[in-house]
């Protein structure tokens, strides 16, 4: 599974595409089965959560190359959550989100609240408290394993784009 440093986004897509027949087959049983498997795979890709539960041996991830313990920069088992969320929306397994002011406001608050927590917020605006918060809560923002706050941020940003584009 050799992958040069940080070049594993294309192999990540290949792993996710290999998972596609499983998800489509599960959808014939129940879309809830798809969502349960998506969530379980994502959960077992969360290194920090498993570590805190003493279950790190169950972590789903590939080594970047056979001779080291370096992990993939984009763990496909974490990132499949965003891929299959989009797939579920396109297949109609998840209904189109309604466009309303309350959801737009909530999504905007989430996106703006992430600015201080971003590297730009820390570097350009001097939000030093955010650095401490990020260190203490690194699993929530983990890019490699696709932490839950990244997912919430993605959903919020995607919703704002959906609302702006219209039906």
Give short role names for the model-derived ranges.
Residues 1-167:
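Alpha-helical transmembrane segments and their immediate juxtamembrane cytosolic regions
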